[in-house]
Swiss-Prot record:
Gene Ontology terms: cellular component: cytoplasm
Catalytic activity as recorded in UniProt: 7-phospho-2-dehydro-3-deoxy-D-arabino-heptonate = 3-dehydroquinate + phosphate
GN (gene name): aroB
Pfam families linked: DHQ_synthase, DHQS_C
UniProt source species: Chlamydia muridarum (strain MoPn / Nigg)
Cofactor: NAD(+); Co(2+); Zn(2+)
InterPro entries: Dehydroquinate_synthase, DHQ_synth_AroB, DHQ_synth_fam, DHQS/DOIS_N, DHQS_C
GO function term, MF aspect, one: nucleotide binding
Record protein name field: 3-dehydroquinate synthase
Electron transport among keywords: no
Length: 373
């Protein structure tokens, strides 16, 4: 079964199996398919795709890149360009990225720049990638530890989402993706929350598929209104302004989902402190929703996991200065939450200047709580 979730801003299909020949129906056999993945997924996920492509008469090439966030570098990017050039791959060939956010970010960026643009298909293998990284055409690489500093907007030709692939994920890694689901619920669609009430129910393919579809539609509807990230798309940065700063400081020792989880808690505290959030219980509800999936809700949780020395408040504030949204102020603007399911807007903008005083107080309070124990 192949189900079209939406075709805006680009097609996304929910599929029962990666062996389905129908997946390849729109691809021309005159050009090769270039599968790009890492060595773990080459064993776990790639075989059915390769087998099906070859049985249909496609010529295929496989390129393997290193695993993890540390692979999102110019070295990997240039390696792929050089491999494509060495193999004399024509620009009509389709690149097929098979992996989580890291693989898809790199493959999308290579596709957007090799021969000034090649078609590519995303085959996300993590929940984060299925409901977030594969949607909307943002791609890129890190510069040193600065997240996504070099990149482009380039939409995939298609996204093939196969929920059964997630059964090979460890539970904790699956939960990292739930952080982005909770983000979607809080900024735009509170009706996602009931699907998340019972973690055990997500072991059923039906419930999991429902969760994936609802999140894809939520993100796609936001991105479809603002591909270039000048307006409403900015609400998808909820939790990511502080989250990315923390990821940078922790240099790969915490997952994206964990960083975003704590980022959302801190940014909700900021929304309350600045009088933007209308519901005083919003923080309590958010923390409960995160804890249900064993997601961290404080800096203390992050440091306990990473086992690194505690940063100072000023180190966290200075990491924020690398944020791409930053203009002239000392702090980048933040996405704030008005109520569950509604990100705040201010004078037509979805990011608002933050009070240095309030943010410093919130960070210091969270850091001091660690010293008290």
């Amino acid at each position: 079964m192949i189900e079209l979730i939406t075709d805006k801003p680009h097609p996304m299909h929910l599929v029962d199996s990666l062996c389905d020949p129908q997946l390849f129906a729109t691809l021309a056999k005159t050009s090769p398919l270039i599968f790009i993945t890492n060595s773990t997924l080459e064993i776990l996920v790639l075989p059915p795709l390769l087998e099906t492509a070859r049985s249909l008469g496609f010529s295929v090439e496989i390129l393997i890149i290193p695993e993890g966030e540390q692979a999102k570098t110019e070295t990997t990017f240039l390696y792929l360009h050089k491999q494509l050039a060495t193999l004399t791959i024509p620009r009509q060939a389709t690149l097929i990225g098979v992996g989580g956010g890291v693989v898809l970010d790199i493959v999308g960026f290579v596709a957007s720049t090799h021969c000034r643009g090649m078609p590519f298909i995303a085959v996300p293998t993590t929940l984060v990638a299925m409901i977030d990284a594969s949607i909307g055409g943002k791609n890129g690489i890190n510069l040193d530890h600065i997240k996504n500093r070099i990149g482009s907007f380039y939409l995939p030709k298609d996204v093939w989402i196969c929920p059964s692939v997630l059964s090979s994920l460890p539970e904790q890694e699956f939960y990292h993706g739930i952080a982005e689901c909770i983000k979607h619920a809080y900024i735009a669609d509170a009706s996602i929350l009931p699907i998340l009430q019972n973690p055990a129910s997500l072991r059923s393919t039906k419930q999991l598929s429902l969760l994936i579809k609802r999140n894809c539609l939520c993100k796609a509807s936001i991105v479809g209104k603002d591909i270039r990230d000048h307006g409403i798309r900015q609400i998808l940065n909820f939790g990511h302004t502080l989250g990315h700063a923390l990821e940078m400081l922790f240099t790969g020792k915490i997952s994206h989902g964990f960083a975003i989880s704590v980022g959302m808690v801190l940014e909700t505290k900021l929304s309350l402190a600045m009088g933007v959030a209308r519901n005083p219980n919003i923080l309590h509800f958010l923390v409960q929703d995160l804890l249900r999936y064993q997601l961290p809700t404080s800096l203390k949780d992050l440091y306990a996991q990473a086992q690194i020395p505690i940063h100072s408040c000023s180190q966290i504030l200075s990491a924020l200065s690398y944020d791409k949204k930053k203009q002239n102020a000392s702090l980048p603007p933040f996405v704030m939450i008005e109520e569950i399911g509604l990100a705040a807007s201010c004078n037509g903008s979805f990011c608002q200047p933050a009070s240095n005083h309030f943010l410093t107080h919130i960070l210091k309070e969270d850091l001091h709580a660690m010293h008290d124990h």
